[in-house]
Amino acid sequence: MIEELQDYLAKEFNIHFDNPALLAEAFTQASYVNEHPNQGLKYYERIEFLGDAVLELIVSEYIYKRFPELPQGKLTRLRAAMVCEDSFSKFAKECHFDQYIRLGHGEEMAGARERPGLLCDIFESFIGALYLDQGRPAVEKFVQRVIFPKLDMGWFDHAVDAKTSLQEFLQRDGDIAIEYHLVEESGTENDPEFKVNVTANGDVIGEGKGSSKKHAEMQAAQQALDNMRNKNK
């Protein structure tokens, strides 16, 4: 499968990995490693951590230079729309990365290949591997093709960082303490679910669920915004 991925990347993106082991690591889930304990395999978790940071930096610099008139708050909202699970999972699907993930049998049968959280992770880990193998210029070339054109296509026109919007909405009339609390953590290691609530001055104003705490917080903030806007109608 990794050899097929190398051929695909070479043909579609003109990307040639000098160290294929990095690519294999980036597309391997823990469940696959657990089912092949004697092969000395690595899975994507550490390399995903790096890819997430690289993507945030490159996207931040790009929108900072492209939109010199945008204030910090709007830059933050735009970046949050571009650098998030929903966007990254769509990019991964568009790049057909879902076809090359190495999964354990149980995860395969559970439909993990279509799971947005996993697709997001794989996109980030691929970026981490590309950065380690070929450096920042190669990553920039890739995202210039895959991510940045979506700005002109209107992908992010109506996307909003709900946490930032909630903060602006609540604090326009004064300082209000906004806090996010992890209420429940369930699911499995490969398919976790987090439940979070958001409070304003100690009162619960919204709840959310997601495959990460960050995503659950976004959902909680969005529910709080919807509730308050409905009250003001």
Curated annotation (Swiss-Prot):
GO terms for molecular function: double-stranded RNA binding; metal ion binding; ribonuclease III activity; rRNA binding. Its cofactor is Mg(2+). GO terms for biological process: mRNA processing; regulation of gene expression; rRNA processing; tRNA processing. The keyword Cytoplasm applies. It catalyses: Endonucleolytic cleavage to 5'-phosphomonoester. Residues 205-233 are annotated as: Disordered. Pfam families: dsrm (PF00035), Ribonucleas_3_3 (PF14622). The keyword tRNA processing applies. It is found in: Cytoplasm. SUPFAM superfamilies: dsRNA-binding domain-like, RNase III domain-like. Residues 161-230 form the DRBM domain. The active site is at D52, E124. Homodimer. Belongs to the ribonuclease III family. Digests double-stranded RNA. Involved in the processing of primary rRNA transcript to yield the immediate precursors to the large and small rRNAs (23S and 16S). Processes some mRNAs, and tRNAs when they are encoded in the rRNA operon. Processes pre-crRNA and tracrRNA of type II CRISPR loci if present in the organism. This is Ribonuclease 3. It comes from Limosilactobacillus reuteri (strain DSM 20016). The lineage of its organism: Bacteria, Bacillati, Bacillota, Bacilli, Lactobacillales.
